[in-house]
């Protein structure tokens, strides 16, 4: 059990039989009344974000989670097979438990988060920024730079990303996997 004032970003708590991760918090001390914590909690199972207010003295059930690096090996049926970098054990993870699955490549190292008490995989996080080569995009027209125009491009994982007109096929770009947005061109 932890006190509400001990909640930080990344803290895992169990509430109403569901597991939540804190993604944002604010310690509020109003001029009148008791101090409280305003939090944003993300449901691990379905990804819903819930705003919740806790009184400072309130006790919450904390969950100990482990974050370990795993390497993506291959796909088998509907599952993705990952290998633990420390023990070399292989585990299957379902498609819907992987954040940023569209940008997953063989050999990529991801963080697998699991419940420490039950060893159940909660989710896997692809790195926030990845570098990928563009496999197909339409050529940009010379002089078509009056506005910040974007065009679709397919990267080596098969995902489609919106990139600026000056990006050509064969170039390597950096992508933010949280929203699939173009970050920049990678210098060779």
From Swiss-Prot:
GO terms for molecular function: translation elongation factor activity. InterPro entries: Elong-fact-P_C (IPR015365), NA-bd_OB-fold (IPR012340), Rib_uL2_dom2 (IPR014722), Transl_elong_fac_P/YeiP (IPR020599), Transl_elong_KOW-like (IPR013185), Transl_elong_P/YeiP_cen (IPR001059), Transl_elong_P/YeiP_CS (IPR013852), Transl_elongation_fac_P (IPR011768). Transmembrane segments: none annotated. Keywords: Cytoplasm, Elongation factor, Protein biosynthesis. Pathway: Protein biosynthesis; polypeptide chain elongation. GO terms for biological process: peptide biosynthetic process. It holds the Pfam family EFP. GO terms for cellular component: cytoplasm. The keyword Hydrolase does not apply. It is found in: Cytoplasm. The keyword Ribonucleoprotein does not apply. Involved in peptide bond synthesis. Stimulates efficient translation and peptide-bond synthesis on native or reconstituted 70S ribosomes in vitro. Probably functions indirectly by altering the affinity of the ribosome for aminoacyl-tRNA, thus increasing their reactivity as acceptors for peptidyl transferase. Belongs to the elongation factor P family. This is Elongation factor P. It comes from Phocaeicola vulgatus (strain ATCC 8482 / DSM 1447 / JCM 5826 / CCUG 4940 / NBRC 14291 / NCTC 11154). The gene is efp.
């Amino acid at each position: 059990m932890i006190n509400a004032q001990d909640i930080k970003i990344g803290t895992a708590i169990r509430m109403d039989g569901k597991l939540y991760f804190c993604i944002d918090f604010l310690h509020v001390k109003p001029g009148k009344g008791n101090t409280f914590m305003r939090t944003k909690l993300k449901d691990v199972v379905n990804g819903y974000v819930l705003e919740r207010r806790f009184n400072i003295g309130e006790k919450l059930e904390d969950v100990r989670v482990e974050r370990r690096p795993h390497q993506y090996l291959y796909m088998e049926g509907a599952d993705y097979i990952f290998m633990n970098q420390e023990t070399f054990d292989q585990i299957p993870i379902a498609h819907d438990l992987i954040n940023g699955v569209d940008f997953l490549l063989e050999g990529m190292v991801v963080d697998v988060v699991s419940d420490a008490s039950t060893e159940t995989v909660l989710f896997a996080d692809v790195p926030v920024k990845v570098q990928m080569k563009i496999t197909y995009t339409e050529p940009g027209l010379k002089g078509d730079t009056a506005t910040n125009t974007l065009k679709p491009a397919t990267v080596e994982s098969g995902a489609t990303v919106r990139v600026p007109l000056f990006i050509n096929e064969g170039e390597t770009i950096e992508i933010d996997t949280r929203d699939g947005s173009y970050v920049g061109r990678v210098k060779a």
